Amino acid sequence: MTVYEGLKNKYPESDIVYTDGYDLATNELHLMDARNAAMQSDVVIVAVGERFENSGEAKSRADINIHPNHQLLVKELKKTGKNVVVLLMGGRPMIFNEMTPHADAILLTWWLGTEAGNAIADVLAGDYNPSGKLPMTFPAHVGQLPIYYNYKNTGRPETKEIGYSCRYQDIDFEPAY
């Protein structure tokens, strides 16, 4: 369920306009379409962040800034004079300081499940209050992130211990001590 589908479900009588916006590849036509759609709207809801395949195990990055094209998109949409609500999607803390002054509201959505669109629409409609504490710290700058040298990389195959098995067995193991 996409955010667009969730909003259509929540507001079936409303005219909700969707455009591709501005993806990670530079495409001025998409940016122009997003600007034109924003000019015809009462409020702008823009989803930015990272792709779902870029977060998770063995997906470490040295630069966790929001992609410059996404920052530009939010900045350009704010120039329309409309209220801009940013949906920040990702699976890790990200740096979005440059985007913050151009957003009237930012909702951190993480990567939700199959009902993400309905859940996000419920929050945007005020039917649910997204209260609570962040489960991790969001740095203000990349320089605040610890960078380790000469540590074992993530994503290596796990080492199987002696006696390890992926099935049930009737084998007695002697203690190692």
Model-derived features: positions:
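Surface-exposed amphipathic alpha-helices with a cationic face
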Residues: 8, 74-81
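Glycine/threonine-rich flexible loop motifs
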Residues: 48-68
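Functional beta-strand-loop-alpha-helix junction segments that form "active/interaction loops"
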Residues: 1-37
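An anion/phosphate-binding loop that grips the pyrophosphate of nucleotide cofactors and donors
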Residues: 41
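A short helix->loop->beta-strand "cap" motif at the edges of active sites that frequently abuts
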Residues: 13-14, 80-84, 103
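Extended, hydrophobic alpha-helical segments in both membrane/secreted and soluble proteins
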Residues: 69-74, 84-86, 106, 120
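Secreted, periplasmic, or luminal enzymes acting at the cell surface/secretory milieu
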Residues: 1-4, 8-11, 89-177
